[in-house]
Amino acid sequence: MEQALLAIAPVRISANVVIPFIPVVAVFIGALVALWRRPGEGLSSAIQHFAAGVVFAAAAAEILPQVKHEGAIVPTAIGGVLGVATMLAIKKLEERWKGPAGMISAIGIDLFVDGVVLGLAFLAGERAGFLLAFALTLEVLFLGLTLTTELAQSISSRVRVLALTVGLALLLPLGSFLATPIGHLPPDWIIGFLAFGLMALLYLVTEELLVEAHEKPDTPLITAMFFVGFLGLLLIEEAL
């Protein structure tokens, strides 16, 4: 496994430089859309369901097999527990922060963690990193919509709102870059970090995207978008 990681390290480093900026572009687009006209609750819920399905598929199809097949029980357990504990701790902090500053801090942490998880995904392979980047792009697109809408209520300048939103989105590639050196650690350490990332992704799907989506009016078509996203990513994976 260690030789395989070293063999593809140059490819991963190159991908880590470019791919993490794709979600930043999505945040920029989401911010522009929100400044012009915020999507309705139905469309927002559909996007969240679809994004949840894509993220879940990326975690199940790319990261889970890597963790499972290595059979490293102790690193998997430690990484998984730390992943869940970290996400719960972040949620607790977000509940204490109020107002625009609290929202900015919470979204900033979410984006940074997403970036770290994206960087970890490349440890499972270039395809895993690409597919997860696609999944996270959909998620942060919605974050861009939400953040811009909230900031526009307290900041009159659209340019400042756009600049602040995009600046915050740069925390995602920063997190991805910081995760890159993990690829040089021993295999058991890498599995532990992959287990950490897997738990973070599952938390994102079950406790953030779907919970927020179900706070809005729901229809069978909107619910079906989760499965459309899941199946769609599986088909893309088979085609690659």
Kindly give the residue locations of the regions a language model identified.
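Intrinsically disordered, metal-sensing/regulatory segments
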Residues: 1-240
